[in-house]
């Protein structure tokens, strides 16, 4: 959904409601757990957040509160949605003076702790009213060497005709999102 004005809360509720029961817009649901499917652009980015349990806990809290989307030009609406498989959200973005809402649903959660390793995160997948088609995983990892990492892994391809037409611009916006998301979690974990 594109608009010249910011969508109201009512618009957001109506948009999410219209997408809530629809199937994912791609058939390889859950593929961010394994190998990405052919025919998609794959992005894998990570940054070291620091060391220790406090850093890990702060980063986990940041993910639970959607801080990786608290970027000024991109947000999750409605804010405060719980991380649960099946939850539908909208990614709201303002780019080039236009507002957009993009529907996504949480595919799976990760909450693992084994010996001195821990990992927390989730993946969401695109729904029919999203400009892209694919899946994105956000994880925080705490390794045996005490290092803590934030990892973003995604596969996608353009779905909306305007995004297909302007795919180089869309790729730059995806790269901007990654850079800003990494910076947001770095800041939140300190």
Language model region names:
Residues 1-95:
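Hydrophobic ligand-binding cavity/cleft-lining segments
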Residues 12, 16, 159-190:
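A conserved amphipathic terminal alpha-helix motif
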Residues 24, 45-47, 104, 122, ...:
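A broad, low-specificity signal marking well-ordered, structured residues that form hydrophobic/aromatic
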Residues 31, 111, 157:
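Residues that form or immediately flank small-molecule/cofactor binding pockets and catalytic motifs
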């Amino acid at each position: 959904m594109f608009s010249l004005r910011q969508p109201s809360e009512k618009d957001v509720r109506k948009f999410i409601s219209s997408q809530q029961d629809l199937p994912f817009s791609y058939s390889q649901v859950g593929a961010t757990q394994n190998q990405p499917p052919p025919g998609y652009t794959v992005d894998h980015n990570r940054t070291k957040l620091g060391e220790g349990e406090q850093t890990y806990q702060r980063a986990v809290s940041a993910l639970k509160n959607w801080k990786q989307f608290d970027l000024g030009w991109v947000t999750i609406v409605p804010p405060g949605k719980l991380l649960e498989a099946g939850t539908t959200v909208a990614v709201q973005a303002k780019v080039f003076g236009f507002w957009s809402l993009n529907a996504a649903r949480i595919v799976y959660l990760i909450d693992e702790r084994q010996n001195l390793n821990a990992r927390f995160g989730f993946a969401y997948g695109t729904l029919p009213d999203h400009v892209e088609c694919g899946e994105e995983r956000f994880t925080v990892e705490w390794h045996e060497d005490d290092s803590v990492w934030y990892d973003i892994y995604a596969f996608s391809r353009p779905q909306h005709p305007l995004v297909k037409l302007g795919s180089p611009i869309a790729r730059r916006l995806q790269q901007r999102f990654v850079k800003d998301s990494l910076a947001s979690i770095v800041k939140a974990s300190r």
